[in-house]
Amino acid sequence: MNVLLSPQPPFFPHQHEPSRRSPPRIMSQHTMASRKRKADDDDNEMSISPTGSPAINSRQLSRPSKKVRAGIELAGRPLPLPRLLETLDKSQLRAVLQTICERHPGIGHEVMVSAPRPSVNGALEVLGEYQDKLRAAIPFGNSSSEYTYFRVKQPLMALVDALGDFTPQFLPPVEQQATVSLEYLNHATKIVHDLPDFDSQQYRHHKDGAYDEISRAWALVITEAAKRGGGFHLHNGKWDQVLAKHNQQSGGKLEQAMNAMVNEVGWVGANSNAHGQGSSSDPNSILNQLINGTYGAPVQVGPF
């Protein structure tokens, strides 16, 4: 029994006795420096390698996904209106617009009010296109007047109708500037000169009618221009000489315009009015000189 018992009685610390603390570890400066370097190396590795960062691991980078129209099936569809208009050329667009205006007169009126006025160059460009079509229809070689007329009848009437529509646009009171009106009439008269001449009288009525209309247009512009500054624009632009050449080329078919030039403009008809003669029977009168194309020609003085 004595053998089993401990020779020393067990020791129980007193409750008021302070517990023993473990002795403090004394770490060498070498150990602390090595651990500090290791911690710094770990931080550097984590900052260099994105996979080593716990923040990167917890947040996965998302790639931008393609925008897919969900629920919309791909199928054929008409072009939008702006794209459709881009495919139309000038003639097609003009035809579509004209059809819409004919179906809806209100839209046609709105277009006429909103569209800018045509310029002389714009009008002459359109007339030039009609003139090109007429020239292309003229047959080659010596053809009879009847055959030639029926070949060119449609483009000829189209050109004459276009002249009849454009000419009033450049006449007063629509056009207030006499120089603009005279410029248009000068080019329009040249177009009339180029209309085909036919041997038969029954085929020449288109050209004769065009001369008559253009002559009345000249007379109207001259009359209105004479009311402003005594026809200064006519004198400054030498329009009397231009008109005389046109009349001579037409074979005297611009007589109404020539009469307006003499009667309305004082400096043209001064010679005849001074002698109290209004008739054109005198071959030396201003009117006859304008008609004959001799107005402004040098006059011989003396016996030579």
Curated annotation (Swiss-Prot):
GO CC aspect terms: cytoplasm; nucleus
Keywords associated with the record: Cytoplasm, Nucleus, Protein transport, Transport
Gene3D superfamilies for the chain: Tethering factor for nuclear proteasome Cut8/Sts1
Keyword presence, Cytoplasm: yes
GO molecular function, one term: proteasome binding
GO BP annotations listed: nuclear protein quality control by the ubiquitin-proteasome system; proteasome localization; protein transport
Principal subcellular localization: cytoplasm
Pfam families: Cut8 (PF08559)
Keyword flag Ribonucleoprotein: no
InterPro entries noted in UniProt: Cut8/Sts1_fam (IPR013868), Cut8/Sts1_sf (IPR038422)
Chain spans, region Disordered: 1-69
Source organism superkingdom: Eukaryota
Polar residues bias: start-end ranges: 46-63
Subcellular location: Cytoplasm; Nucleus
Chain's role: Involved in ubiquitin-mediated protein degradation. Regulatory factor in the ubiquitin/proteasome pathway that controls the turnover of proteasome substrates. Targets proteasomes to the nucleus and facilitates the degradation of nuclear proteins.
Similarity remark: Belongs to the cut8/STS1 family.
Subunit structure, interactors included: Binds the proteasome.
UniProt name for this protein: Tethering factor for nuclear proteasome sts1
Gene for this chain: sts1
